Amino acid sequence: ERTHSANFLDYYIICLINGKEYDKAEDTLKKLLKTDDSNKDFLIDLGYIYQQQGKTNKSEECYGKAIKKIIPQNTAIINLANKFKNIREYSWAIKTYQQGRILLKKPDAFLKELGDCYLMERDYEQMMPLFVRTLELNPGSIDNITAQLSFARSNDIVNSIDPVIEKTLKSLCQKTDYLPVFDELAVWYNLQIRNYLLALQHAVLLNNKSENKLHIFLN
């Protein structure tokens, strides 16, 4: 009987999963879904149980159903994606954000969230354009972007991110709508790899473009 709050049910299911009582959790979720088949959280929980048991097809079916039930509401999309991220299903979180963009008719929605997911997937080729677009729309996010890149570099064992950053910076230099924030990004990166001469060159360029000539981007 569904006499308990939604929070109680969530914790109950989590306890069953953590205790590896998959059969009991599966039966409970199936009963709940019979009376509430639109509950995306239950679908993801059921999919996770299948995934833990190696039932990939059933798992993907549940995850796919959850995404199809998304409504065009920013909070609902973020909550569903967070549910996927909590179980480290970043590729499904990405699909959630992408579907959310379509529903909201906002192609630039969830830039940071998508970038963070690609970072966790170590898909730097997909990540960098999202970070660049974020800087284009909001140059003030440079500190957040460089912090994310620092995190990625510190966890990049095979040195696969630096070539992507360098390729991105090179392509940015060829843009007709080159922005000062790209110089900030270049200064930061070249300081990380100790290419001080190039860092200085970009710092001078940045200072020349600054409206406030007292702003000297040198330390």
Please name every model-derived segment.
Residues 8, 42, 76, 110, ...:
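TPR alpha-solenoid repeat register
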Residues 18, 52, 86-87, 120-121, ...:
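Register position in tetratricopeptide repeats
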Residues 3-4, 37, 71-72, 104-105, ...:
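Short coil turns that delineate tetratricopeptide repeat
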